[in-house]
């Protein structure tokens, strides 16, 4: 998570209350987080995860949880172990869908979805890719 993107340093776990440009940034941050979580924890994320509200909420919560440990905000070894043990249950939530998630292939569909849900690309905002 990039705390420089918002005032206060933390995005909300849900995008719906944000303004259209903030929504774009929220989704872009989640995209980057999902790409990192997929690699780090070998999660079976499926193509189109952004269209499933349960998967979006699970991924946003997991990203926030991991971020708190990575930044040192939380220093709780039993809590970190709990996170690691929860990965199997979280992974089960992410198995819905036919095709595996491939960031380079799925990027255009993801960007189209952002427009569908009312996001507005900020001015001078590059493509985060994946």
Regions found by a protein language model. Name each.
Residues 35-73:
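Amphipathic alpha-helical interaction modules
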Residues 16-17, 64, 92, 112:
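Polar/charged alpha-helical tracts
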Residues 18, 22, 26, 47-54, ...:
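Conserved aromatic-histidine-acidic binding/catalytic patches
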Residues 29, 36, 57, 61, ...:
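Charged, amphipathic alpha-helical oligomerization/scaffolding segments
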Residues 74-130:
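Amphipathic alpha-helical binding modules
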Residues 2-46:
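Short terminal alpha-helical segments
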Residues 17, 36, 55, 109, ...:
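Low-complexity, compositionally biased segments
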């Amino acid at each position: 998570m990039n705390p420089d993107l918002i005032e206060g340093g933390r995005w909300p776990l849900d995008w719906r209350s944000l303004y259209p440009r903030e929504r774009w940034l929220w989704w872009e941050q989640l995209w980057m987080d999902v790409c990192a979580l997929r690699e780090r924890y070998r999660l079976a994320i499926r193509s189109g995860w952004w269209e499933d509200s349960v998967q979006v909420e699970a991924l946003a919560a997991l990203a926030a949880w991991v971020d708190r440990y990575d930044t040192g905000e939380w220093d709780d070894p039993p809590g970190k172990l709990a996170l690691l043990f929860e990965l199997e249950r979280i992974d089960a939530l992410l198995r819905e869908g036919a095709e595996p998630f491939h960031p380079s292939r799925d990027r255009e569909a993801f960007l189209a979805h952002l427009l569908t849900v009312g996001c507005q690309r900020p001015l001078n905002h590059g493509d985060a890719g994946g």
